[in-house]
Amino acid sequence: MYLKALDCYNSSVAMFNDTRDSLTSKDEWKISYRSQHQHAYTGLWRSLLRRGKITEALLAAEEARSQALKDLMDFKYGSNAESYWSPFQIRSAYDSLSDVASSTIFMAVSGPVIFLWVVQGCKVHLRATEFKEFSSEEELTTLLNRLYINALKEIGTRTVKCENRSLDDDRSDEAVVEDRTPHDVFHPLFREGNTLKRLYDMIVAPILDLIDSKELLFVPEGPLCLVPFPAFVDSKSKYLSEAHFVRVIPSLTTLKMITDCPVDFHNSSGALLVGDPCLEGVLYEGKSLAKLKFARKEVEMIGEILGIEPLVGVAAKKREVLGRLSSVALVHIAAHGKMETGEILMSPNTTMENGPPEEKEYLLTMTDVLKADLRARLVVLSCCHSARGEVTAEGVVGIARAFLGAGARSVLVSLWALGDEATLEFMKYFYGELSKLKSASEALNRAMKCMRQSEKFNEVKNWAPFVLIGDDVILDLKKS
């Protein structure tokens, strides 16, 4: 029975992949198409699990992740990388996973179960946590969304005071998810309180005995893409980031494509710092936008640390920014941004003599970035909740994904808006560590530690929103 089901799912997935390939460069179409056929991809790896094929199931689940992003990166790197899983030609699992970092935690949600694969070198372990209180994946997803809301409430993200750099919905982070979450939830699991510990117990505790490295690499799915892993709390009230560096990747394949590209593909020197572009006279969607004085302070402070002159105000023209993207190793942007589409507002190329400028004169789109040949090792997006976006079967579709697809080796983003002074303090610590040739992952971890140890910014809301997505990189900023 399972063999017949496996054959059917294999054939379906192969057909869906062929159809998706025919969509060529239509990224939005691919994302929508992938979501419509989630059942086939899930059915494939679940069928493999029923036959006890743990590693093959992991590879099949991986093949379904971030497919449209992989296509963007294929175009960027020209790698024509093979998927980890080929339904008609199963390669050696050891060969497929030999370059996966340890400890890598691949997560999947199916039915009322959270599946956790832990990759240690060529060894793959599986732990599954079933929520017997629920009968469907929809109910479990509702729980995860509710835990996300509760975590934000307990962290206190609503109390953050900062200048608004977001071009998205003005509602709170919680309200956006509330719309998708039923209100008639009375089960004890939905209660508020100790949410960060409950998330630890659900995701980390089941695999704790399998973790054997300082760095944890998470490959999340669904609502788990938005949770603050570094702030998870163990039974001894210690944060996960106190024991481990934490990094996130969209899929195993996308990371492999980055690490397999030629050594000289990404730039080794140069930095572009952009803050508070002048938007005087600009009407975006009929609205004028305020100046971002703290964004300006932010890049000016970073410029002093690195010895680099930032582009601020009128100097931060779209044309100037695009002209520099291809030649720098570091890009830091503190400006108005739209998380779902990856658009960022720059100073217009034209003057106001002929009236308000057209959007194309100041709106930096991902199409623009792709054409500009971005080759940065690290992109830091200081645009409010830049880690967020629409959660789909493809993954989180937002500004961070856009920059990875455009060629960034790694992207640092934030899950929620941070206070203005806290942002300055964090960036001071982060870039201080980067300038000492610490890797981005270690610099992030050390900056979090410094914030926790400070008297003014030790609350979780001030240090836990940051997420490093992609590869870990070291920048020799003295070359800049």
Label every PLM stretch briefly:
Residues 58-67:
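Catalytic cores of secreted or luminal carbohydrate-active enzymes
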Residues 2-3, 14-42, 68-85, 457-460:
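Acidic, Ser/Thr-rich low-complexity linear motifs
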Residues 87-145, 161-480:
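Catalytic cores of enzymes
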